[in-house]
Structure formats: structure tokens, C-alpha cells
Amino acid sequence: MRPLNAAELLKSRSQDHKLAKPQFLSKKKRLELQRAKEDEEREKTELKRKTNTLKRSSPSEPETILDQKDTSTANKKRKKRFNFEWDDEEDTSSQLEPMMAYPTSNNDFLPAEEHWSDKKLEDMTSRDWRIFKEDFSITCKGNNIPNPLRSWKESGIPTTLLNTIDQLGYKEPTPIQRAAIPTALGHRDVVGIAETGSGKTLAFLIPLLSYLSAIDKDYMEVEHKQESNLNKVLGLVLAPTRELALQISKEAKKFASVLGYNVVTIIGGHQYEETVKSVQDGAHIVVATPGRLIDSAEKGLIDLSQCYHLTMDEADRMIDMGFEKALQSILSFLPSTSSSGFGLDSTIFKVKSRITLMFTATISPPIEKITKDYLQTPAYLYIGDAGEIVDNINQKFEYLGDNVDSQEELNAPRTNKMISALRQHIRETEQPLIIIFANFKRTCELLSVELSNQNVGSNIVIHGSKSQEARESAIASFREHKVNVLIATDVAARGIDIPNVSLVVNYHMPKRFDEYIHRIGRTGRAGKSGASLSFVDDGDSEILVNLKSFLSKGTKRLPDWLLRHPAVQSLTLKD
């Protein structure tokens, strides 16, 4: 290559020097330069278009146009621009020649699809409803199940009841309420599968209250107030434990006092005279445990012959507690699923068959049998899954190996570790509420004494040997933060609704794994985070495989001791 001439180098340097100095340009000069640049761009575009046209008209002579170009000019242009690895002929983007002209748009992108929360109810598409259900972890099984609630105002609930909901401060429905209420309002049987603390109580109380409001006014104001009809139950709610029944009654009375209905609570530990007195104001809603309800029905204290609205809350727990036969007996007292479709009752109560709502945390064979025998084509509504429980609760374990505990005396290593953890939790937590579960009543009493001696919080004990009055008083004291440690057997594991429990301690692991879920379900409720501490020994081998499977549904690492335990490596998961 021949070196550049010295004169050319000096000339180029002089021009570069001039360009390096900033120069003032008038507005007129700037406009002239801009127009010249635009003219040059238009010429380039026109030349390119003609070139492409000729290429398409003479496919056998692709080099013709290039041969006509000035070679030196082409070389100069190539020096000024970046060279790609492909030739210009291979640039397919330059060959676009639209058949018609399209109007220009200021936005090259389609507008984002409107979110379901910004749409009117009538504009919701099937895709919107799928997204809605995913957002609230709702799964439905069955035919012709209505869409969930988006808000209270779109629910179709009677206005007086809707106003009461607003007055009591219920701002937004929970997922189980969104799914169950529209279905139950349509007089469809429901099986709701959801954990405790998900808002199930309101999910069945609102349909029940709506049902009562639709009953013939003359019947409610005249006939039902006759002495012979006062004990006729209009709506029945069954619960497995006294504590849960009291909790449901408390919630129901908030609405009933405003709407003019009477709530009767029938549970063990209360005198029959109390039941007789309660029904004098009408048995609009009865909340009961199975055993005491059967006794009251057999004694003629209540009449279930016109009860067309039945709710079974925590049905799985009732089965676990041996109430399966009691449930079947109660169902025999009620009208059959089709009897109200005939005669005067269908006109008075505005239903064609009995409405049955069942809520459970699990679906077991006994639950399936009751569903098949006593419910009519129910809608199955699943809320969330076990993975949510795993991630909402920070579950910690202390593995003690063969250091198995007894009920005669406290296990020193276990007790000392627990006391240390309790002190740290109380120190780090604002307004702590702690529930300690033990398998033996004697252990509960011994733990109470030990915690008092060690000045660890203030505690109270609840178990099956305590009177009903003592148990209710203990739960009230704990709920009101008069004490911050509740020591209990499994009698308190399900049903009681105590918000903001910060820690659950399993001093003993339960013998059944589903009880472990129910225990730790006292914390981390309604989407809040919680914590649990469980002491595990080799006597708990029967539930370790299930524990591993349960923890695997979460996102946290499994404990090493659990992965290495012989029971996990040798046993198969039990259904």
C-alpha cells in the first residue's frame, strides 16, 4: 500500500483543526444544514428503493447495479461505516414493500390488557376468572359452579345483611368466602376444603343469614312465634368442640343482634335449663356439638323437622373424635335432602331441598361417605395448599434421639431447651402469645409449675379434666393477653380462634401427623407469618415420613437429622 502524500496529511490536519474549534451558527445556517441532511437521506432512501426494484425485476443479473456504481465512491463509503459479516444483498429487512399504506401510529405496541380488578363484572372473560382464581388459590370441582365474589357489593347478598357486614368492618372477602358464598346462596351443597383461620365462619354464616331473611315473613312473625313452634330449629351449625361452638356463636350473635335473630348454643358443660330458656326467643340459629344436640333432640328440647339449612364445620375433626355415628343420627332427625320439594314447606322456606354445607381441612374416606350419602351433587371448593402453611410458619425442630419423654416427670434436656427458646422469643417479640402442646395432662401441670418457678412469662393450663367454665375462662384470659402462655393438650388444638399467636411449641409431637398440622395452624393464620418449635425423639418415628413429605412442599431446606433418620429411609409414606 502506497503511503499518503505529506501535502494531503497537512491539508487533512488543517481541516480537522477547524472542526475541533466550536463555531457559532446562526438559526438560518442551522436550518440550511438540517434541510441538506434531510435531502441527502431522502436521496439515499430513493436510490435504495430503486436498487431493490431492479434486483427483483432482473434476478438473473444480481451484479448489474453494483457494476454501474463508482468503485471509488463505494470504497470511501465502506471506510466510513461498520462492515457486517454479511453482504447488503442478504439484508432481508430492506426488501419490504407493503401492498398498501398503513396509517402511522404514535405507539408501536398494543395496549396492555386490562386487569380484572379494573373491569366491570359483566366484562369479565373466562381468562379473567381463571386469573382471579389463581390469585386467590381457589380450585373448584363440580358442574355449574358460580364464579367467586370479587367484592361484597357484587355478591347478591340482601341489602340489610350487606349493611351489617360493612358496619362490622369486614372490608374484603377471604378466598373461602369468595368461593363458598355465591355457591351456597344458590342453594347448592358445598364441600369447602380450607385450613382453620381462613374465614370459614363467615363463609357459612352469611348464606345461613340470607336463607333466614328469605323465609316467608308471615311464618317468621306469626307462626314461628307460637309456643309450639319456638323450639323448631331453622338453621343448624355443628362443631366438634365446645370451644369452636362458642366461637361460632359469638360471631353469629354479632349479626343476629342487628338482624333480629336468636342464636342458641347447645354444648356440654351447660345445663339443659339454659337450652330451654334460650329457645324461648326462637331457635333461629342453633350452634351445637353432636353429642349434646342428640340428647336435646331426644328429650324434645329442640325440633329439627323444619331445619333445611345444615352446616358441619371441621367435619374431619368430628370424624376423628368418633362422631361419625352421631352425625348420621343427627342427619336422620333432619328433613331428607328432597322432602322440602313437596308441600307447603317449599313455599314457606323458599327451597327445593335441604342445603348442606361441609367444611373440612382434609378429605378422608369417612368424609367422602357422608358426602355421598347426605349431600346432593356438591361443589368442591379447595383453598390454597399445604405449601402455604409450610412457608407461612418458620418451623424449627430439636431432635433428641433416643431421649424419649415420659408422663411421670419432665425431661430435663427437653425442658431446658424449651425454656431457653421461650425466653428469647418473649424478649424479641412484642406482645407474644405462646401455645405449648403436650400429650399428657400431668405434663401440662408440671410445665406450668416449672415455667412459674423459672419466671418465664405468665401461663395458664387447659385440658380435658378442666371444667367447661375453667376452660372458657382460660381461653378468654389468653385471648385478652392477661397471660401470654397457654399450656394445652389437643383439646385446644382445633377450633378456638385466637388471633396473633406468635409461637407454637410441641413439647411432645402428636401421635398422628394431621394433629401436627392442626397444632401449628394456631400460628401463621390469615396470611400472617408465625413460628413453631417441635421436640422430636425416636418415639415419633411413625410420623417422620409424613413430616418429611409435608416439609418438602415448602421452599426451605429439610433438617439433616430428618433426611438421615432410619424411619425416613425405610418406611413408605402412609396415605
Swiss-Prot record:
Motif (DEAD box): 313-316
Subcellular location: Cytoplasm; Nucleus
Domain Helicase C-terminal: 421-566
CDD domains assigned: SF2_C_DEAD
Composition bias, Basic and acidic residues: 10-19, 31-49
Motif (Q motif): 150-178
Domain comment, as recorded: The Q motif is unique to and characteristic of the DEAD box family of RNA helicases and controls ATP binding and hydrolysis.
Name recorded for this polypeptide: Pre-mRNA-splicing ATP-dependent RNA helicase PRP28
Originating gene: PRP28
